[in-house]
């Protein structure tokens, strides 16, 4: 059975299609299952979706930028090359820069925007692993199952984090920062029970899971600086 969909010269792995479907389902969850369904958050939802779409496009086609010489010599081969850890890092950088630009341009609540994007990723990963379960390294004779149920671990952590984000009321540092740090540490730790650290089945260095935590800290500092500038301007 083929594990990829061929459209002309392009080859799209089914795991990528499943990830896209999971992200779409996660947006529906944001739109109808959270407090972001309110009309006052419409712009936040739209920009969150735009930023996510930009990240997906960069992940799928970032290989062109990373391998320009090869692209000029054999463009079809490069375009059919699946995205990996480097493309994912490039996508994260583009999403972070795009987020800052949109926050400044539209005077958006940066914490709310980060929460929307982070929630979509966590919900999507939970959905993805529910339908695409994976097992990790052997457990030996210590546990009743032969291999670590990595997907179960990820779903459990994702469920706890989603509950925290949507039921814990408070400021950015009280609500989002702890959730991001808990998720980053847990996903980094889970990787040691798997054959390799992965995100949506894409092998990545374990340090990649700390990127959202770094982004949350950057956002917190950015928000504080903005507030001080506004306060100084008003006084």
Identify the function of each model-found stretch.
Residues 1-235:
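Hydrophobic, membrane-interfacing alpha helices
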